[in-house]
Structure formats: structure tokens, C-alpha cells
Amino acid sequence: MKNKVLSLGLGLLVAFALNLQTACAQDIPKDSLTQVSIQTTDGNEYTGYIVAQSPESVSLKTETLGTVSIPKKMIKSIQRIRKEQIVAGEYWYDNPYATRYFFGPNGYGLRKGEGYYQNAWIFFNQVSYGITDNFTIGAGVIPLFLFAGTATPIWLTPKVSVPVKKDKVNLGVGGLFAIVAGEDNSSFGVAYGQLTLGPRDRNINFGLGYGYAGDDWADSPTITISGTYRTSKKFALMTENYVFDTGDNNTVLLSFGGRFIGRHVAIDAGLFIPAEGEDFVAVPWLGVNVPFGHPAYD
């Protein structure tokens, strides 16, 4: 079983790399009414309308620079700009991490061809990728073997997403299925369902999950209430909250923070605060996210 999970995890990483290479070869829209964003290999980004193209270059009509000619060999990516990405006249690039909060998922999935790498506190590592617009798969590891440890947690995170009403109501069903490599009978994880109300960048999410260890499942579910609100092109507020049934009573874990959304990297920073106890305790969260791939849009 462990070898199968390890092989599947490695296979996913190879598939991500192959899809990343394939995604770099993109079709150039021929419709001059379609607004696009062009990223170039020297790190620049241009938005506007393609008015002409030749085998060697693309002519883009921009609002601030007029018409510019961009050599095709310098084009790293071309993405169509959707109307919901124009906010108060400003182009907001996609937030590919909007399918989750600090750690917990919501009802949205990654778009086909879209992926990212997540690292939290150095040890936690996960890669997620959109196989289709409705199916996302992830693989993660805490590489304790690098620190003379033999027991290494590894996991898979499949998720199926169903848009009930596009950009307004989304359902997600999935799980985190893990083992500890180097230990016997070490399987554990959680199976969950998520209901997300609102678009990807501004929503509230209600979740219900049942955890398990080995063959034993929890008697009662864990409840999650989370949300995000993107306040600008480069920043979003986030909260992720849990209610655990610990037997005698419920344990509540609250969190609050934000996501700094760069074009090529994003930083998650926040505090997790247990609601019980007389003393105030706050555990910091720090994560780094790096996108890859190029999603396909309608």
C-alpha cells in the first residue's frame, strides 16, 4: 500500500511537470475584441487587444503605451481577460490559491492546467493540480527523512468540485488520505464536503468532515466555517475556523490573517487561536505559494 501511494505521488509530480511544459505552447487569440494579458520572458506584462500578428511578432493595443510589437519568441504566456477580472477599471490577475484558505479547502477546484506548490513552515510541502475543471489532485509530504527521521507523512488530496450556480454556489467533495512511511498501520485522514457561497475571491464556506485513523472513524464530524475577501489586486483577508468534538465538549479553533498575492508568488500569514482557556494563545501561520501551469478558459 505504501509503495503504491509513493509511486502515485511521484507519478503525479511527473505529470505536473509534463503538463507545465505542454501549457507553455499556447494559442494566440485572433479576435481583436478579446482583451488579453501577455507575460514576456523578461518579466514584463502587457494588457490590451491584439490588433495584428505575423509569424514573428504580435501587435498589442494597450491603454497606456499605445500599440506595442512583442516578438513571439519573448512571449511566456497569453491569457484571455474575463470581465470579472476588471475591478474598478483595474485588471486583477487570477488568484490560483482561491481553492483553499490557509490550509482547509473550499468548494472550488483548480481550473484545468492550473497548479501551485505550497510550503508552510518549511516542513509542509504540497503540489496541487487541476486535471479537469471539476477534478483537482494534490500530493504532499513532510520530509522528515531529510533530518535523520525514518517516519515520513505523505498524502494525497483528491477533490471533485461541482458548480451549482457559476461563481455563486459551489460544492466540493474530497479528502486527505495519508500514511506515515516507515510505520505500520499508519493510515489516517479525513473525508469532507464543502459548500461555498460567493465567487472565488469573496466567499464564505461551510464544511463538514469525518476523520479516521486506521479502520476507526470519528463518531462526530468536524465543522469548518471559513471565508475570504479580496480587497485589492494584491491582498485578500482570510479566516479559517474549526469546531472539534473532543468527547466531553467542543473545541473551537479560530484563525485570521491574509494573503499577499503576487504575480509569481503569494504569502499567507495569520494567527490560529484556540478559543478555550483563560490564557490568550496565538500560533502563527506562514506559508509560501508558487503557481505553475496555464489554465484553460471558456
PLM features: residue spans?
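Bacterial N-terminal signal peptides that target proteins for export
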Residues: 1-10
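C-terminal segment of classical bacterial N-terminal signal peptides
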Residues: 15-24
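Compositionally biased alpha-helical segments
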Residues: 24-116, 121-123
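Short hydrophobic/aromatic-rich beta-strand segments that constitute the beta-sheet cores
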Residues: 60, 77, 119, 137-139, ...
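Short, surface-exposed connector motifs at secondary-structure boundaries
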Residues: 106-111, 134-135, 234-237, 265
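Transmembrane beta-barrel domains of bacterial outer-membrane proteins
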Residues: 110-112, 120-147, 151-159
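Outer-membrane beta-barrel translocator/channel fold
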Residues: 148-228, 234, 238-298
